[in-house]
From Swiss-Prot:
<feature type="transmembrane region" description="Helical">
    <location>
        <begin position="457"/>
        <end position="477"/>
    </location>
</feature>
<comment type="subunit">
    <text>Interacts with creB.</text>
</comment>
<dbReference type="InterPro" id="IPR005829">
    <property type="entry name" value="Sugar_transporter_CS"/>
</dbReference>
<feature type="transmembrane region" description="Helical">
    <location>
        <begin position="286"/>
        <end position="306"/>
    </location>
</feature>
<feature type="transmembrane region" description="Helical">
    <location>
        <begin position="353"/>
        <end position="373"/>
    </location>
</feature>
<feature type="transmembrane region" description="Helical">
    <location>
        <begin position="75"/>
        <end position="95"/>
    </location>
</feature>
<feature type="topological domain" description="Extracellular">
    <location>
        <begin position="119"/>
        <end position="130"/>
    </location>
</feature>
<dbReference type="GO" id="GO:0019630">
    <property type="term" value="P:quinate metabolic process"/>
</dbReference>
<feature type="topological domain" description="Extracellular">
    <location>
        <begin position="478"/>
        <end position="537"/>
    </location>
</feature>
<keyword id="KW-0472">Membrane</keyword>
<feature type="transmembrane region" description="Helical">
    <location>
        <begin position="160"/>
        <end position="180"/>
    </location>
</feature>
<feature type="topological domain" description="Extracellular">
    <location>
        <begin position="44"/>
        <end position="74"/>
    </location>
</feature>
<keyword id="KW-0832">Ubl conjugation</keyword>
<feature type="topological domain" description="Cytoplasmic">
    <location>
        <begin position="347"/>
        <end position="352"/>
    </location>
</feature>
<feature type="topological domain" description="Extracellular">
    <location>
        <begin position="374"/>
        <end position="387"/>
    </location>
</feature>
<feature type="transmembrane region" description="Helical">
    <location>
        <begin position="194"/>
        <end position="214"/>
    </location>
</feature>
<dbReference type="InterPro" id="IPR050360">
    <property type="entry name" value="MFS_Sugar_Transporters"/>
</dbReference>
Length: 537
């Protein structure tokens, strides 16, 4: 088996890998388009001269400018932090489908409020709209990865949850380029900077429409006792009849897991809270999932996403139009590499190895960029023309993007969506998403001050954190590719961690062979398309 081979936990009919499951993942991932667009457009929009003129930016002190810009950016993350936890009761009681609908409606309300912002009214509507939009995307960042992972066959679960990350990057690509577009094509005016705010309504509108046609998660339906509807939805998604051996195995595994949970954690709304505090295994896994987002934000990605003009200025890029263009190229690189990650890497190379490679390569690149800024001091030069050293620094910045994007950008979301049992999954994802938005908030809130005080030290700071993340992943995070959701407990109990994947996958295949042998002995035989029971005359 090569490193780029798909890993199946058992023989899987080709019907399982059908277009319907990709369509469901794509519709749900409109949530991440909302997130990606918002994270990309806001920093470049508030750097437009038309925005600064309308709000009399030049009359503010430098410290006041940093405060206002960090407030505009970080209030969104603050709302998203609370939205991630707000999604838990919605996802538990209403389901994944209607949870996605609620997140889209709240985001749309927030985006609409932002459109009322102008110089006369000040920043109040903008602040309020950012908080509401954050609530919406925070809820969506909880529910979407869970929904997709609960639909997915193990062999392509990473790829399908990766569609969520792809949506994030497509939204980001549009967000990075739209400000370059309005700066090139429209004269400085209120219209020039309000158009990027209005575009937020497109992905949320698509999600509202698409959510009406989504199938509810079969695993959530099983959890709520709606068995017939769950089996019907699962058969529709898998494109197989209920009595096919693959379906018998999957339904049996879900039943067995729920029965185990009923006897241990319990299936009620409050049971996961009690389990999280009393069960050390669950608490430990919550810690791992939350820490993945600490290390993700410790790479510096959100400092770059939200304040890309500041980042490029520190390297020596001058001129607002040039800064917008280089930011757009950053978005293109991320999107292209995300396609590669989605189609060839996440389910073939695996989660763990990608994190290790990305952290090592990304750290080296940031050390080089920081060293260039320390030695060359490009922001202090009278000659603003970028020299060979500056071009090399830009190369290593984009190389950092190539290392980071297929590793730490989307992989933590994939791992968190698959590493918990069904009844704890919503709460666990809320904790993971909340952790993401907490660190996101802190980075976005203090990045302007960090660049003002630390200068090149910002790059050394993030490079050091990426080195530390290698130790964390190697000793604590097992490989999860190809492992059924119902077997995650066994994976995290297998030691040593760096060999757990191979050990458990071998056990699962042996168990599956015994199951099929016992099934055939009990009166089932294979036919071309399905399994038929043998009845003696």
């Amino acid at each position: 088996m090569s490193i780029l081979s798909l890993v199946e936990d058992r023989p899987t009919p080709k019907e399982v890998y059908n277009w319907k499951i990709y369509l469901l993942a794509a519709v749900a991932s409109c949530t991440s388009c909302m997130i990606g667009y918002d994270s990309a457009f806001i920093g470049t929009t508030i750097s437009l001269q038309s925005f600064k003129d309308e709000f009399d930016w030049d009359s503010m002190s430098a410290a006041h400018q940093d405060l206002v810009s960090s407030n505009i950016v970080s209030l969104y993350q603050a709302g998203a932090f609370f939205g991630a936890f707000f999604a838990y009761p919605i996802g538990h009681f209403w389901g994944r489908k209607w949870g996605l609908m609620v997140s889209a409606l709240i985001f749309t309300l927030g985006a609409g409020i932002m459109l009322g912002t102008n110089g006369d009214r000040g920043f109040g509507l903008l602040y309020g709209g950012r908080v509401l939009a954050g609530l919406g995307v925070g809820a969506g960042s909880n529910i979407t990865p869970i929904y997709i992972s609960e639909l997915s066959p193990p062999a392509i679960r990473g790829r399908l949850v990766g569609v969520y990350e792809l949506g994030w990057q497509i939204g980001g690509l549009v967000g990075f380029w739209i400000c370059y577009g309005v700066d090139e094509t429209l004269p400085p005016s209120h219209k020039q900077w309000i158009i990027p705010f209005a575009v937020q309504l497109i992905p949320s509108g698509l999600l509202i429409i698409g959510a009406l046609f989504l199938k509810e998660s079969p695993r959530w339906l099983f959890l709520r006792g709606r068995r017939e509807e769950a089996i019907k939805n699962l058969c529709w998604i898998r494109q197989l009849p209920e009595d096919h051996v693959y379906m018998i195995e999957e339904i049996g595994a879900i039943d067995q897991t729920l029965e185990h949970q009923r006897a241990t954690i319990g299936l009620g709304f409050w049971k996961p809270f009690a389990a999280a505090w009393t069960n050390k295994k669950i608490l430990y896994r919550l810690f791992l999932g939350s820490m993945l987002f600490f290390w993700q934000n410790g790479s510096g990605i959100n400092a770059i996403n939200y304040y890309s003009p500041t980042v490029f200025k520190s390297i020596g890029v001058t001129g607002s139009n040039t800064s917008l263009f280089t930011t757009g190229i950053f978005g293109v690189v991320k999107t292209v590499v995300t396609f590669i990650w989605l189609l060839w890497l996440i389910d073939r190379v695996g989660r763990r190895l990608l994190l290790l490679i990305g952290a090592a390569g990304g750290s080296i690149c940031l050390w080089i960029v920081g060293a260039y800024i320390k030695i060359a001091r490009p922001s202090e030069r009278e000659n603003k023309q970028m020299d060979g050293g500056g071009i090399a620094a830009m190369f290593f910045f984009y190389l950092w993007t190539v290392f980071y994007t297929p590793s730490w950008n989307g992989t933590p979301w994939v791992i968190n969506s698959e590493m918990f049992d069904p009844n704890i999954r919503s709460l666990a994802q809320a904790c993971a998403a909340g952790s993401n938005w907490l660190w996101n908030f802190l980075i976005s809130r203090f990045t302007p001050q960090m660049f003002a005080k630390m200068d090149y030290g910002v790059y050394f700071f993030f490079a050091s954190l990426m080195i530390l993340s290698i130790i964390f992943v190697f000793f604590l995070i097992p490989e999860t590719k190809g492992i059924p959701l119902e077997s995650m407990d066994r994976l995290f109990e297998t030691q040593p961690i760096w060999r757990a994947h191979g050990t458990l996958l071998k056990q699962i295949r042996e168990d599956e062979e015994r199951f099929r042998h016992d099934l055939e002995d009990s009166g089932f035989v294979k036919s071309t398309d399905r399994q038929v029971e043998v009845v003696d005359a």
